[in-house]
Amino acid sequence: MLLKDKIIAVIYGGRSAEREVSLESGERVTQALINKGYKVEAIDLFGPGGRLNPVKQLSDAHFDFAFIALHGGEGEDGRVQAVLDMLQKPYTGSRPLASGFAMDKALTKKYWQGLGIPTPNYLCFSDKPDLEKIHREMSFPLIIKPSREGSTIGISKVHTQAELTKALEDAKKYDSDILVEEFVSGPEFTVTIIDDVAYAPIGLKPSSEHELYDYEAKYIAEDTQYLLPCGLSDDLELEVQALALEAYRSLNCSGWGRVDIMQGSDGCFTVLEVNTSPGMTSHSLVPMAANYAGIDYDSLVEMIAEQAWHSFLETC
């Protein structure tokens, strides 16, 4: 069975804080599939046709396979994936449990610590943050972030008590669980994984106006530097790729994803998070890594879709 004989639903939009990013990802993925000769049905989840009942929106749509271009919320935490499983519609990316696991940063960090996969020390608070515990166990600067949000939305770097209080309040707007993480002083890298193959790491260097590679540095700023090659030696590049694969596989992720990694002042690498539904916008990192490997955007989208389709056929 050829995927080109089927109808592909590109599911995008959603209602998370990353909706605007997803809208661009979905539009670009849709056009890429059309350019490659596929039959496409674009579905803006929670858009005009699905605000009241997105499950019905999906069940009423006529398609055979889904390319998930949702970011954050139910589009990345396993809920949409579970609905598609119940509808018996194959799709790109990780299964429901892996998606939900990876979306919860606190849960993955606790798991990685048990496995011996290096990740920055942290505290997680579900209710009111314990400021005394934070001061007792950690020292400034700190990173404050929602535990289950993407695109670095709600993230802050804090140096003082006043900044900490405000950052905790800001992060609470996006999630009930808040992560307080030690700041790793050093360069940041991201590794794209497609079909269990790690691509060349990209070095991320925000401008001097941005302390972090945050939402603005990702999607708005024009002066963020993306380093390819990333500036590491060949041996260290291989080390970063191996660590990314170890973190990705530990969560039982599949299809494609992206792993964010920091290098500390001691030269050691630590894993920040795994993204199971990365951005596919004009500023996004997965297309950048693929392009460096000689894969253009349209071919990248086709590769992700075909890999997922063939994996589905192997299980039939």
Q: Which role does the model predict for each range below?
A:
Residues 82-90, 115, 194, 292-293:
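Alpha-helix C-terminal capping segments
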Residues 40, 90-91, 119, 142, ...:
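Hydrophobic beta-strand scaffold residues
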Residues 1-97, 101-103, 107, 126-133, ...:
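ATP-binding N-terminal substructure of ATP-dependent carboxylate-amine bond-forming enzymes
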Residues 159-242, 263-270:
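Phosphate-binding site of ATP-dependent enzymes
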Residues 1-11, 58, 101-187:
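Active-site nucleotide/adenylate-binding loops and adjacent lid/helix of ATP-dependent enzymes
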Residues 3-6, 233-316:
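ATP-dependent carboxylate activation and anion-phosphoryl transfer catalytic cores
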Residues 80-85, 212-220, 276:
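Short, flexible, mixed-charge acidic loops at enzyme active sites
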